[in-house]
Amino acid sequence: LWPAWVYCTRYSDGPSSGRSPRSRRLKRNKKPEEKRPRTAFSGEQLARLKHEFTENRYLTERRRQELARELGLNEAQIKIWFQNKRAKIKKAS
């Protein structure tokens, strides 16, 4: 057994009073069944999003609103799709 001060450094592998940085933090206010289901884009929606992405990797607010209206999606779905697409390309390179 080691004295308490041995475990007080941020580089220690020993036990600590805080949470492990690798542990997943669960949101206590949401139950798993309340999680919003993953959006399943139609082929037409995907083709349109991909086309828009080839034209411009970043959308203006106005263009995002237009796309959302034209595709029957909400703006957040459009925004997240573009963010994920940029992240995927960055990760691959």
Curated annotation (Swiss-Prot):
Q: Does the keyword tRNA processing apply?
A: no
- Localization per Swiss-Prot or TrEMBL: Nucleus
Which CDD domains would you find in this protein's record? homeodomain
Gene Ontology cellular component list: nucleus
GO MF term list: DNA-binding transcription factor activity, RNA polymerase II-specific; RNA polymerase II cis-regulatory region sequence-specific DNA binding
Which Gene3D superfamilies does the protein's record reference? Homeodomain-like (1.10.10.60)
Give the DNA-binding residues.
34-93
Q: Which family does it belong to?
A: Belongs to the engrailed homeobox family.
Name of this chain's protein = Segmentation polarity homeobox protein engrailed
